[in-house]
């Protein structure tokens, strides 16, 4: 695997592959990789001639009181994992490489990006959309791979690509989970032993939402209320977002019918924010209907 830190060198390296007619897949990350990231790499490796992974902790998507300085980093470990995963090129620029001057241009998807997680992290998704657009411009991939764990982010990127006619296929990859169901995340390392134990309630809260839907509850507000009550059973859990939405538009709706439903959770444990979600098809919910 070749590690590249400058835009010019990366463009030169990719030009050779383009001239040879090879397809390029991009896996954008902020590093400190886990098995969820490696599933993105596995998908990219199986679907492209050349795989580029990027590691860049993007300051534009961190708020003033967020964990930019503390975000976990271990480039040597990440390089080893990516090499073992069959990545051809690692693009690992510094902030001065990506943003040599203060950014005057921002890409924003304001409607999708201002609700749910965006409501408690203002500006976050504009930072995500801006850096992803810049990576797309630099790499010009045929396909780009994102985890479904960050479902709102995935839908924002899909809408951005559609609106701007960016020539890339966005591939969503199902969430990879730990043994107790907790979604794999680089931020899981922040959890204390007690917080990690408590965090298992997050996937169980998704189970509770699915059980309620299977039992015939059709009012989103009632399901949200009961999921909040379920989370209240864990004293260390501080839910910030519990929302049922349309999985395509992320908009609220009046009543559950036969269409798929997105349940999205944003829960704090101490200083750590955990995201999770599930798309539930009411007619095929995994839990037996309650009489």
Curated annotation (Swiss-Prot):
Binding site for ATP: 30-37, 147-150, 176, 184-187
Keyword Nucleotide-binding: yes
Catalysed reaction equations from the record: (R)-pantoate + beta-alanine + ATP = (R)-pantothenate + AMP + diphosphate + H(+)
Residues binding (R)-pantoate, per UniProt: 61, 153
The protein's Enzyme Commission number: 6.3.2.1
Pathway membership: Cofactor biosynthesis; (R)-pantothenate biosynthesis; (R)-pantothenate from (R)-pantoate and beta-alanine: step 1/1
Keywords noted in UniProt: ATP-binding, Cytoplasm, Ligase, Nucleotide-binding, Pantothenate biosynthesis
List of residues binding beta-alanine: 61
Active site, per annotation: 37 (proton donor)
GO biological process: pantothenate biosynthetic process
InterPro entries to which the protein is assigned, alphabetical: Pantoate_ligase, Pantoate_ligase_C, Rossmann-like_a/b/a_fold
Chief place of localization: cytoplasm
CDD domains: PanC (cd00560)
Pfam families linked to this entry: Pantoate_ligase
One annotated GO molecular function: ATP binding
An annotated GO cellular component: cytosol
Entries under SUPFAM superfamilies matching the protein: Nucleotidylyl transferase (SSF52374)
Protein location: Cytoplasm
Function statement: Catalyzes the condensation of pantoate with beta-alanine in an ATP-dependent reaction via a pantoyl-adenylate intermediate.
Quaternary structure, from the entry: Homodimer.
Family in the record: Belongs to the pantothenate synthetase family.
Leftover remarks: The reaction proceeds by a bi uni uni bi ping pong mechanism.
Protein name (Swiss-Prot/TrEMBL): Pantothenate synthetase
Protein's organism: Sinorhizobium medicae (strain WSM419)
Taxonomic lineage: Bacteria, Pseudomonadati, Pseudomonadota, Alphaproteobacteria, Hyphomicrobiales
């Amino acid at each position: 695997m070749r590690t590249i830190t400058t835009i010019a060198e990366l463009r030169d390296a990719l030009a050779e592959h383009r001239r040879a007619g090879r397809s390029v897949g991009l896996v954008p990350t902020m590093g400190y990789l886990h098995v969820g990231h490696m599933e993105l790499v596995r998908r990219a490796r199986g679907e492209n001639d050349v795989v580029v992974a990027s590691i860049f902790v993007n300051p534009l998507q961190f708020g003033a009181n967020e964990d930019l300085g503390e975000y976990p980093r271990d480039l040597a470990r990440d390089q080893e994992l990516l090499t073992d995963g069959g990545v051809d090129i690692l693009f690992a620029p510094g902030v001065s490489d990506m943003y040599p001057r203060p950014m005057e241009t921002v890409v924003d998807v304001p409607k999708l990006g201002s609700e749910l997680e965006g409501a408690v992290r203002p500006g976050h998704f504009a930072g995500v959309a801006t850096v992803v657009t810049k990576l797309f411009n630099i790499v010009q991939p045929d396909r780009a791979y994102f985890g479904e764990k960050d479902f709102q982010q995935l839908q924002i990127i899909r809408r951005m690509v559609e609106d701007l006619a960016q020539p890339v296929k966005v591939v969503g990859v199902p969430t990879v989970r730990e043994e107790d169901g907790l979604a794999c995340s680089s931020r899981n390392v922040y959890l204390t032993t007690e917080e990690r134990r408590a965090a298992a309630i997050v996937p169980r809260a998704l189970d509770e939402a699915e059980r309620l839907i299977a039992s015939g509850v059709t009012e989103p507000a009632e399901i949200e209320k009961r999921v909040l009550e379920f989370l209240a059973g864990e004293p260390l859990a501080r839910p910030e977002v519990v929302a049922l939405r349309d999985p395509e538009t992320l908009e609220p709706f009046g009543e559950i019918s036969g269409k798929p439903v997105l349940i999205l959770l944003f829960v704090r444990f101490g200083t750590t924010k955990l995201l999770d979600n599930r798309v539930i098809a009411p007619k095929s919910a995994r839990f037996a209907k309650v009489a």
